[in-house]
Amino acid sequence: IIGCGKIAQVRHLPEYAANPNAQVVAYHDKNRARAEEMAAQYGGVVCDSYFDLLNRDDVDAVSICVENRSHAEISTAALYAGKHVLCEKPMAVTLAECESMVAAAERNGRHLMVGHNMRFDPVHRRAKQLLDSGVIGDVITFRAVLGNAGPEGWSVDEGTWFFDKNKAALGALSDMGIHKVDLIQYLLGQKVIETTAKVVTLNKRDSEGNLIGVDDNALCI
């Protein structure tokens, strides 16, 4: 596990622990105490750097649960180290980074997966079956809405990186909206070819009272 924040704590680690075919053996987080807490709870060792973790022979695959800006860097390093990768969404912050990750996976013969977990929801899988069978007919419009209380109600850190543009790079559209962008393409079996989007930052402030630098509302057509 690289990155031991909230998504690792509530999704990745509990689900690996419940899977008899998986064993978590190593952790890295910039906050070492956080990694040590997870190791104490689930077993395994703490590594001083993600390079140390990737160099371990007993690591077959890694979950990358770090800030958006570091997804491509760490994923690519893991693939070249011969590890399979499950990277949290968004895949990366530029198209070039995404392409470099795919190239690294192909070049090293390793699996690269992005955490678009809504594809595996039983309701969505059933909808996919109905759409593919033609029972529903042609889809003319598709409307999806997703919202939550915001990173301030989610992150383990009061000063969450989600509000730091240098780390998050993007905002609500990439952190939340990406689920629906992927789901639409999965359900319909078609790729998005044209988009129009509006992203805005309302009067939202970080834990120190400063206006946040990333969008917290988005509309995409």
What do the PLM-derived regions correspond to, one by one?
Residues I1-Y42:
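N-terminal Rossmann-like dinucleotide-binding module
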Residues N19, R56-D57, D121:
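Acidic-histidine catalytic/liganding microenvironments
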Residues N31, G44-A104:
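Beta-loop-alpha module in the N-terminal Rossmann-like domain of NAD(P)-dependent dehydrogenases
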Residues M118-N210:
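Predominantly a Rossmann-like dinucleotide-binding segment in NAD(P)-dependent oxidoreductases
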